[in-house]
Amino acid sequence: MMHEKLKKAVGWAALEYVSSGMIIGVGTGSTTDHFIDALGTVKHKIEGVVSSSEQSTTKLKSMGILLFNLNDVDGLDIYVDGTDEINSNMQMIKGGGAALTREKVLAAAANKFICIADTSKQVDILGNFPLPIEVIPMAHAWVARELVHLTGGLPKYRQGVITDNGNIILDIYNLKILDAIALEKIINNIPGVVTVGLFANRCADIALISSDLGIEEISRSIK
């Protein structure tokens, strides 16, 4: 119950970054669902939203929030989404909900990426959470062998999951990711991989982290 309260608190806290006339990218997941609830209270002020998944689209429609296709807008003012892990460099593992490809596209299209999470998602080193990879179905066995060779991790097929794009998910276990940018590039270069759930090249600009002490705002340092 306390964990759910932390998710709700940070979801609603992200509303402070919403301004009139914005086009907002909306992620996927239980924490993002709380942001959608909050967004419903200001739906008359914003231009509309672009959704990262059918799951979020269903909830947004139920709230009466205007939806756009990404192809019909020039870009996004902000993108708000949760995460499975986030490190001090604002790099993330995402994709537990199997929406990683569309999430990554929206993050890239946004002027500002706001990550919302509770403190349990903060880690020193990425990799304890299995790293999701979206793969075209005909290539998953070959891609899995390549992943063993290139990463040393253990890829497992996520049973019963088909992405909104019609693909499958491989989750890589037993990773200790010390160079997330390099690993993201290596995995994305494997033929058959649609994308990997490492958000390192396009990391978060702001992280809102909820704990028993309240909401902490962390901004990405520009090096």
UniProtKB/Swiss-Prot annotation:
It catalyses: aldehydo-D-ribose 5-phosphate = D-ribulose 5-phosphate. GO terms for biological process: D-ribose metabolic process; pentose-phosphate shunt, non-oxidative branch. This is Ribose-5-phosphate isomerase A. It is an enzyme of class 5 (isomerase). PANTHER family: RIBOSE-5-PHOSPHATE ISOMERASE (PTHR11934:SF0). HAMAP family: Rib_5P_isom_A. Keywords: Isomerase. Catalyzes the reversible conversion of ribose-5-phosphate to ribulose 5-phosphate. NCBIfam families: PRK00702.1, rpiA. GO terms for molecular function: ribose-5-phosphate isomerase activity. The gene is rpiA. The active site is at 103 (proton acceptor).
